[in-house]
Amino acid sequence: MSGPVPTTRQPAAPPRAIALMPAVLQHEWDLYHATWFTLMGVGGGIFLLARLLRLERGLGVWLGLPVVDLVSFAVISAGGLLLIWSLGRPLRFLRAVLKPGTSWISRGAIADFIFVALGGALILPGLALGGATSFARLPWDPWASTTLGRVIEGVALAAAAIVIVYAGLVLADKAAVTFWRSWAIPAQFVFSSLAMSMATVMLMQTLDGTPIESLECWLLAKFLALLLAVIAWHVVTRRTQPGKAEALARLHTVYGGLFWGVVITAGTVLPMLLAVLAALVPPTRDALGVAALLLTVAGGFLLRLLTLRVGYFPPVSGVLRVPKR
């Protein structure tokens, strides 16, 4: 006599994750921050490039001081004031500055202060007011021709480099927004800043009657080529990652015309081609330098603004479990 046929219990299907909250578009970072990022990049970049290429003497002197350095300090100061404005309250700014161990805003703000202070000290011996050079006895000069001057210049250059890169690191470092959490964001901002700065230096050469050399043109073209490569890498990799997928969809649909028309074509590819043409045809350099500045600044600013405006917090999903009785 046979007993009942035992039944085999099928293993329970693993619980499936369900969506708890969709991707949410961020609204805190916008126009002020894009302007701040742009000013910091250009302000630090023109000092860095002019000094490394030893062009500061050929970009004009006013009251015994290098004009390019004065422009750099003014742009950085404007960016710093905008940072304070964007944070809303002075005390909030102070709290942000006092966290260098965890905050790139704090590190960048400190670098801003060091840059302006040491850069200002570097050029101070050249100050001439009414024919008097009250600080000429200092053991260095604005052109860093002494050992102490070169040390001051070196620290100022290091601070300028941090000023250029920290805006991108603010976004990329531990960001909850997926589109920003990539090395490509600070890399884009750096190459864009260097391109805008190189074009600015070329314009200042034109205004001062200093010939633009082929080196400046080739550097501008290389910065833009590297920028284009990094942007391309960023938009074609990890396209399905939660948060980034929504960002790319918004970038291509809502801002597709600005992104492809202004950032990529007019702001990157066109000035890159103009820079190559200027390198090969010297008589065109002055005019093409002006055009390159207008195009790179428009493209660079919009690159930063669109990067902010397509930032999504990723969707949240989870598994609901019913406790066993």
Predicted regions and their residues:
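N-terminal signal-anchor module of multipass membrane proteins
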Residues: 1-59, 305, 310
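Long, contiguous internal "core" modules enriched in hydrophobic/ aromatic residues
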Residues: 28-31, 35-42, 54-59, 102-105, ...
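Membrane helical hairpin/interfacial module
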Residues: 46-118
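Membrane-interfacial segments
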Residues: 56, 88-92, 175, 207-208, ...
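C-terminal ends of transmembrane helices
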Residues: 82-95, 167-179, 235, 307
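Membrane-helix cytosolic exit motif
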Residues: 298-315
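Short, highly charged, low-complexity non-transmembrane loops/tails of multi-pass membrane proteins
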Residues: 311-325
